[in-house]
Every structure is written in C-alpha cells, then in structure tokens.
Design a protein with these regions (language model features):
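A broadly conserved sequence feature marking short terminus-proximal activation segments
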Residues: 1-22, 127-129, 133
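Residues immediately within or flanking Cys/His clusters that coordinate Zn2+
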Residues: 21-24, 38
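Short, cysteine/histidine-rich loop/knuckle motifs that typically chelate Zn2+
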Residues: 26-29, 40-46
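Short functional micro-motifs and their immediate structural scaffolds
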Residues: 35, 48-50
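Conserved hydrophobic positions within beta-strands
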Residues: 58-60, 93
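Beta-strand/loop nucleic-acid-binding surfaces
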Residues: 88-99
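Short nucleic-acid-contacting surface segments enriched for D/E, G, S/T with interspersed K/R
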Residues: 97-110
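OB-fold/S1-family single-stranded nucleic acid-binding modules
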Residues: 114-133
Length: 133
C-alpha cells in the first residue's frame, strides 16, 4: 500500500476530511456568517455561534484581474467574490485563463483545492480557490 501524504489546510476554515469544504461560524441570533473567529457578531452583537458548512458551488459576483502583486506572487490571477448560496467567499479563481474573455459575472464555479507547498517531511499545505463548474 502506498503512503498517503499528510495534508494540512492553509486556513482553519478549509475542511479536508471527506469532501473538501469551507466551514463558517454562524451567529445563532441573526445568521450572519464569518470565516474568522468572533467574540461577538458584527451585525447584532450577540455572542452565540455554531459551525456550518458552506455550499461548495456558487456564482462569481465580483472579480478583478490582478496584474501587479507582491514579489514572488505569480501574475496575472483572478481575485473574486463568490456567492455560495448566500454566503460571500473571497478567493482566487483557479484553472481558468485570467482574462475578461474567460471570466464573467454570474459565472458558475465550484470549490477546488490545490497543493501550495510541501515540507521536508512530505506534508502538503492545501489551499483553495474556485474553478469553472
């Protein structure tokens, strides 16, 4: 049997067990969702939260083609806001040509993961983006 590389998510809200998905903190009072940990909801100031899985598909609501970035970051790439059935997710679009001819508002996309890097022990750091559906 082949060894399976250990995998760790690049961000805490990316869940890799089973089918990859994003998990948010949802306010138990008003339903606002946050990917980071909160002490109180920014919408209603309540303090109760539950963890919820986010839909793995959605539509591009806004995007920009980034042509200038920090040293070492390959350009161009597409930064987008994806509406995942009511939850906004900021992420890069991957596996698509970064040009206006290939990206459009309302474009259907789905969550995808990729290896960001591998350490000396073979552990893979896994990132996420959205690709055309």
């Amino acid at each position: 049997m082949a060894d399976v590389a250990a995998r760790i998510p690049l961000v805490d809200y990316l869940v890799l067990d089973g089918s990859p998905r994003l998990r948010a903190n949802e306010c138990t009072s008003c339903g606002a969702r946050y990917f980071d940990r909160r002490n109180a909801c920014a919408g209603c100031f309540e303090t109760g939260f539950r963890r919820v899985d986010i839909a793995t598909d959605g539509e591009v609501r806004a995007f920009t083609i980034v042509t200038f970035a920090a040293p070492g970051v390959p350009v161009p790439f597409v930064a987008a806001v994806v509406d995942c059935h009511g939850t906004s997710v900021r992420a890069n679009l991957i596996n698509v040509e970064p040009s206006p001819e290939h990206v459009r508002l309302g474009m259907k996309v789905r969550l995808a993961t990729y290896v960001v890097g591998t350490d000396d022990n073979g552990t893979e750091a896994i990132g996420f983006g959205f690709e055309p559906a």
